[in-house]
């Protein structure tokens, strides 16, 4: 059976952190290219870091739709990361959900992942093959059309002299993780947070030891620019790959188990809300 987009109870309520009785389950559509599935899965599972603040571990799980599945990816009983390919899509990813109109409870969700995002917007070797002296490919014209002027231009002008295959793989992987983090955030009930661009100073932002734990920005619900280190500084993460402080706070507010006593519950909620302006 499918899975609701909620977790109601903990297996061991006496413990501060417990697995849920029933986790939120996402399915990767079986049409998703194999080379992208690992990054897609990683982007979903990273939300487990945020759910720990709500008292849950392993709150979210990911499975791959079997090739012989007897259910379609459009079946609303399943939360599916859909793989789509459109000629001129208006988005790289889209995370709609549907709710109970009486309670607001999120009942289910589908996430649309556009193939063009991975082929034209993050495969920089396709965009700049002439600079890199690589062979021509059929995607070249489409790549030029979909060029993002800001962060992608800055990336190439800074890094083209050291554009290794390892660098390309890491860049693509991080961009997929960031996109999936963002879209899953929508399905969990989080709106855009365009005030969360800044978290670290110009030194800490390139320290992977810091950003891999805290994120590059305060929230994955931002539209972040690519993070490019200047020539004299070792390159850190290009994109945020973990929920930020705001995301963890929002999940704690929305998914932590309420207390039975109304007065104590009100105090608990107010204590969480009082941290809304914390750095």
Regions found by a protein language model. Name each.
Residues 19, 28-36, 91-190:
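Active-site-proximal segment of zinc-dependent metalloprotease catalytic domains
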Residues 25-28, 82, 107-110, 219-222:
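Structural recognition of the beta-strand scaffold that forms the well-ordered cores
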Residues 2-7:
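Short, small-residue-biased leader/transition segments that mark boundaries at the very start
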Residues 14-27, 71-90, 95, 100-102:
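Active-site-proximal, well-structured secondary-structure segments within enzyme catalytic domains
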Residues 166-167, 171, 196-279:
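Conserved catalytic/binding loops enriched for acidic/polar residues
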Residues 22-24, 56-59, 105, 218:
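Loop/turn elements at helix/coil->beta-strand transitions in domains of secreted/extracellular proteins
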């Amino acid at each position: 059976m499918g899975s609701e987009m909620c977790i109601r109870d903990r297996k061991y309520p006496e413990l501060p952190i417990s697995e849920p009785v029933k986790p939120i389950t996402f399915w990767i559509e079986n049409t998703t290219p194999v080379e992208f599935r690992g990054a897609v899965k990683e982007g979903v599972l990273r939300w487990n870091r945020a759910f720990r603040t709500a008292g849950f571990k392993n709150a979210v799980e990911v499975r791959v739709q079997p090739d012989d599945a007897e259910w379609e990816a459009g079946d609303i009983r399943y939360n599916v990361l859909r793989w789509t390919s459109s000629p001129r899509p208006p988005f790289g990813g889209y995370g709609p959900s549907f709710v109970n109109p009486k309670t607001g409870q999120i009942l289910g969700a589908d996430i649309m992942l556009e193939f063009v995002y991975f082929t034209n917007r993050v495969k920089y070797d396709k965009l700049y093959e002439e600079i890199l002296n690589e062979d021509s490919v059929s995607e070249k014209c489409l790549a030029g059309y979909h060029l993002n002027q800001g962060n992608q231009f800055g990336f190439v002008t800074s890094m083209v002299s050291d554009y290794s295959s390892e660098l390309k793989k890491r860049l693509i992987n991080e961009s997929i993780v960031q996109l999936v983090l963002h879209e899953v955030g929508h399905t969990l009930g989080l709106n855009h947070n365009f005030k969360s661009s800044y978290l670290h100073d110009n030194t800490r932002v390139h320290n992977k030891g810091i950003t891999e734990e805290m994120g590059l920005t305060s929230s994955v619900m931002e539209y972040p620019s690519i993070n490019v280190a200047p020539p004299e500084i070792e390159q850190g993460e290009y994109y945020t790959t973990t929920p930020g402080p705001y995301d963890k706070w929002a999940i704690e507010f929305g998914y932590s188990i309420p207390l039975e006593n109304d007065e104590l519950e009100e105090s608990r909620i107010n204590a969480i809300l009082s941290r809304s302006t914390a750095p």
